């Protein structure tokens, strides 16, 4: 029965009805060999031939700040960009080899999320990795607290909001950050977390750097709204913000309701736990495909960002995993099988992330 489904049949499934039929089939076979075969037919560099779409409009003077230098956003037209990953956790040599392998799969740019203030060693390691790979590396920074997972150092909890703003701006300039992130909060946002979110929002206004957040993996729709409220309360244009871990919202919490509200307010919906199941959420791939399809059907394709939040060496290619190719080699083939056309896949992997990351430097 599996072999009765051809790639041509799948690519012709462009209506909502046929896409849903394809999606139901994915759920029935739980990511069977059909999906793998389709992905294999388009694997390697040919998988991401990003040449068929016109570039988005970018503001005059906009750049994307990478460790290899500031670049024009048009320079990220021919490779996928992952907006939320963890590169600096790996050994330098291993990270370089993994990135080179993922470049063959179509990766062009990767954002390294911070889970605390950057140490000099972290900065040196990321700079060394960037010098040895053609994949553009963007260093992000900030402060991270999600009770039960990580808490702020005492110094951050004791600092004033003004002092945090000054430190964020100073570190962003001296370490060449290209974004603030991942900025985290707990299931119930604590006063110190509100202080940090306000400080990051104010630092954004002083630098122009975009912001991406972390919401708890335990499924927390209200956390997304709290983060937006605090950040917007400081005067931030929410089109410069990604609310992260939106793929961890469980079906019983009606993820589409949260996703559409985030998008209606102007922010990006960060579906950034793709290609694997996070230990604290266990959302299957079929549910994550449904999230993408539902957002597209609701008219919010311009607000979707994809990533894997990958930094676990056990899941690297050297250990028979997909590493930073998880989105490209595991998740994108499922989108194709579900009927998502190539021009939309390009938008999700190329155009949306560079619209988010492009900024006009200020200050």
Regions inferred by a protein language model and the residue ranges of each:
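Alpha-helical scaffold segments that flank or form the walls of functional sites
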Residues: 70-83, 88-114, 119-136, 160-176
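Active-site gating/metal-coordination segments in enzymes
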Residues: 128-131, 136-210, 261, 268, ...
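Divalent metal-binding pocket/active-site signature
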Residues: 173-253
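Histidine/acidic-residue-rich catalytic or RNA/ligand-binding cores of hydrolases
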Residues: 91, 123, 149, 221-228, ...
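N-terminal export leaders
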Residues: 18-38
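N-terminal secretory signal peptides
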Residues: 1-18, 45
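C-terminal segment of N-terminal export signals and the immediately downstream linker at the start
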Residues: 37-67
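Short acidic/histidine-rich active-site segments
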Residues: 214, 271-273, 300-321
């Amino acid at each position: 029965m599996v072999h009765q489904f051809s790639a041509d049949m799948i690519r012709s499934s462009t209506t909502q009805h046929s896409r849903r039929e394809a999606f139901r089939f994915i759920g029935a076979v739980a990511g069977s060999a059909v999906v793998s075969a389709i992905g294999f037919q388009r694997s390697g560099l040919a998988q991401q031939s990003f040449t068929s779409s016109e570039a988005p409009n970018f503001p005059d003077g906009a750049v994307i700040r990478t460790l290899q230098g500031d670049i024009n956003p048009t320079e990220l037209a021919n490779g996928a960009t992952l907006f939320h990953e963890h590169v600096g956790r790996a050994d330098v040599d291993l990270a370089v080899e993994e990135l080179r392998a993922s470049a063959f799969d179509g990766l062009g740019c990767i954002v390294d999320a911070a889970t605390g203030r950057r140490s000099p060693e972290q900065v040196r390691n990321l700079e060394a990795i960037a010098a040895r790979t053609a994949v553009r590396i963007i260093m992000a920074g900030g402060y991270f607290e999600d009770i039960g997972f990580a808490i702020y150092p005492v110094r951050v909890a004791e600092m004033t909001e003004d002092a945090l703003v000054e430190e964020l701006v100073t570190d962003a300039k001296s370490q060449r950050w290209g974004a603030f992130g991942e900025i985290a909060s707990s299931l119930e946002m604590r006063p110190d977390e509100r202080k940090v979110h306000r400080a990051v929002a104010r630092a954004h206004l002083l630098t122009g750097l975009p912001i991406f957040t972390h919401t708890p993996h335990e499924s927390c729709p209200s956390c997304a709204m709290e983060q937006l409220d605090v950040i917007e309360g400081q005067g931030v244009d929410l089109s410069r913000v990604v609310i992260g871990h939106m793929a961890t919202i469980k079906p019983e919490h009606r993820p589409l309701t949260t996703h559409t509200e985030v998008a209606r307010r102007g922010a990006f919906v960060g579906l950034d736990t793709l290609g694997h199941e996070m230990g604290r959420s266990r959302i299957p791939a079929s549910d994550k495909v449904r999230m993408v399809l539902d957002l597209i059907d609701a008219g919010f394709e311009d607000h979707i960002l994809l990533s894997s939040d990958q930094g676990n060496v056990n899941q690297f290619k050297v250990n028979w995993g997909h590493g930073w190719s998880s989105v490209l080699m595991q998740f994108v083939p499922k989108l194709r099988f579900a009927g998502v056309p190539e021009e939309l896949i390009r938008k999700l992997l190329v155009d949306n992330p560079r619209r988010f990351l492009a900024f006009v430097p200020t200050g």
